[in-house]
């Protein structure tokens, strides 16, 4: 038997398809999401419906976003789900989640077994819509979840960490082995819950500045911030902001990055 075929569908490598088949894991994820009738539930990448079916059983209506035309067609003809689903056959990276929430009249509850090849850019896309999102539950590569939940002074701590924790409270839910999927991926997976802050503990006036600083610092993460951010801050300015200039990018907390972003917004670096 071809281990890339499940329920008659051939897993497409270009879409990063690995289908969840472990019932215990499926039940655990649905329990973590705890969907309730009347909520605006949106699934990204429903695939063959492993999560769609048990979540849909609890809902009157739900929305799914599926890029694969064949899988979208299967869902449109699903005997139990077809009358409940609003299907968007498109790339989730092109979805305006704010419009979707406005149409629903409430913030969205987003979940999915995300294709690992697009998980990081998709997270950044979703972060730009956190005002329209109540919470998110995602199956991701375990290494990505480790980065999302990391603290300073660790190798996993990076730009994704800072931006995720700026926007959301990030909570690991469970780890998932490769054997829970068909075909089995070559990496371990994990489920994470992201809850956008109702009141941001580290408000930033211009998020683009935070993005710029973190990109620059972590692109040169082995350098001290005195060097990696030298065109933006003098060593004296870093010291005044409570940051030792000999620290590296991974040693600086989310709160400190936010402080740097707000200071730079108020004191733009001179053009070189």
Curated annotation (Swiss-Prot):
InterPro entries for this protein: KsgA/Erm, rRNA_Ade_diMease-like_C, rRNA_Ade_Mease_Trfase_CS, rRNA_Ade_methylase_Trfase_N, rRNA_adenine_dimethylase, SAM-dependent_MTases_sf
A GO-annotated cellular component: cytosol
GO molecular function, one term: RNA binding
Enzyme Commission code(s) on record: 2.1.1.182
Main location: cytoplasm
UniProt cross-references to PROSITE patterns, sorted A to Z: RRNA_A_DIMETH, SAM_RNA_A_N6_MT
Entry-linked NCBIfam families: ksgA (TIGR00755)
Name this protein carries in UniProt: Ribosomal RNA small subunit methyltransferase A
Originating species: Serratia proteamaculans (strain 568)
Lineage summary: Bacteria, Pseudomonadati, Pseudomonadota, Gammaproteobacteria, Enterobacterales
Gene coding for it: rsmA
